Structures are given as structure tokens and as C-alpha cells.
């Protein structure tokens, strides 16, 4: 269980930590916060396609394309995702040679449909985007055993300059 202290029961008067248009300063840089995409619940990862469109993953298990100021409906072709607690659809990353091979990699909490309770584990899948859905899905990693604990799934993805994939998996 998690213990959160100091959070009032009535949260209607709480203000955001930073407001859009507000300036955030660090020791070396100033940033301006601006909303680029609205209508997302918990956006987790994003990747820019060569044509300028942006793929956005949401923890709740949806993947969208953002283009010309518009957010697409959720794309089809995703695997079964355990979108509970800290689990869900997590990072997304294009293969370094995406322009030639079309591979998109994403991390997620894979739902174990055989378990009597919602259970799963961290997984990495790659797929190709065709129209409004993912195709050619291939699971390249899935942690075992599954767990019914809904936290610590990781999972960022990166490639080195030789095309090797690296990912963090948390406790899973």
C-alpha cells in the first residue's frame, strides 16, 4: 500500500504545480510550458515519425497519432495490456533505421489472460504502422513470472548507434 500524506480530501482548490504559459527556471535554462496536445489522460511516451507526425502512448493502453493539430482515435492492433496501477502502455521508440524497416518498439505491461486475477509483466513488442493500426506484431521480450502487483514495470527504450536495443524493466 502507498501512504500519501498531506493531501486534502477536497482537492478542488488545489492548483497545478505549473500553469500553461508559465516560465520554469533551472540553474542553467528557462522553459516555457505550453500545451501541444490536449485530451490525453496519462501520456507516457512519444516518438516523431520521419514525416513529422507524432506517436503518443498513454498509460491506459492507447496509442495515438498527432498530426496537423489533431489527435487520432486510438490505433488498433495493440496487445492485451494490463492498465492498472503503474502498468499500461509505456514507452515508444522508432528503430534507428525506421525509414527503411518501419519498426516501432514499445514497452507495456502484458496482461496474463490465464491468471484468475489481473496479472502481467513488462514486455517489449515491435510492430509496423499501417493506416490506423499496428501490424506484424512481434514480442521480443516478456518478463516472467507474471505478477498481480500493479507497480514497478519500468520501462524506457533506447537504441545505440549499432542498432542494439536497451530498456529498463524496473522490478519486472
What are these regions (language model features)?
Residues 1-172:
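Acidic, Gly/Ser/Thr-rich repeat motifs that build Ca2+-stabilized beta-propeller blades
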Amino acid at each position: 500500500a502507498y501512504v500519501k500524506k498531506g493531501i486534502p480530501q477536497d482537492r478542488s482548490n488545489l492548483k497545478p504545480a505549473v500553469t500553461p504559459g508559465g516560465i520554469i527556471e533551472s540553474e542553467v535554462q528557462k522553459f516555457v510550458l505550453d500545451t501541444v496536445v490536449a485530451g490525453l489522460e496519462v501520456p507516457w511516451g512519444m516518438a516523431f515519425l520521419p514525416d513529422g507526425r507524432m506517436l503518443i502512448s498513454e498509460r491506459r493502453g492507447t496509442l495515438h497519432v498527432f498530426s496537423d493539430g489533431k489527435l487520432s482515435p486510438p490505433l488498433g492492433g495493440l496487445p492485451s495490456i494490463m492498465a492498472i496501477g503503474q502498468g499500461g502502455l509505456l514507452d515508444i521508440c522508432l528503430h534507428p533505421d525506421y525509414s527503411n524497416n518501419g519498426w516501432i518498439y514499445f514497452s507495456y505491461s502484458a496482461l496474463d489472460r490465464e491468471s484468475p486475477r489481473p496479472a502481467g509483466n513488462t514486455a517489449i513488442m515491435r510492430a509496423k504502422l499501417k493506416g490506423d493500426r499496428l501490424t506484424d506484431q512481434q514480442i521480443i521480450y516478456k518478463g516472467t513470472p507474471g505478477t498481480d502487483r500493479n507497480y514497478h514495470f519500468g520501462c524506457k527504450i533506447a537504441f545505440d548507434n549499432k542498432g542494439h536495443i536497451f530498456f529498463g524493466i524496473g522490478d519486472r
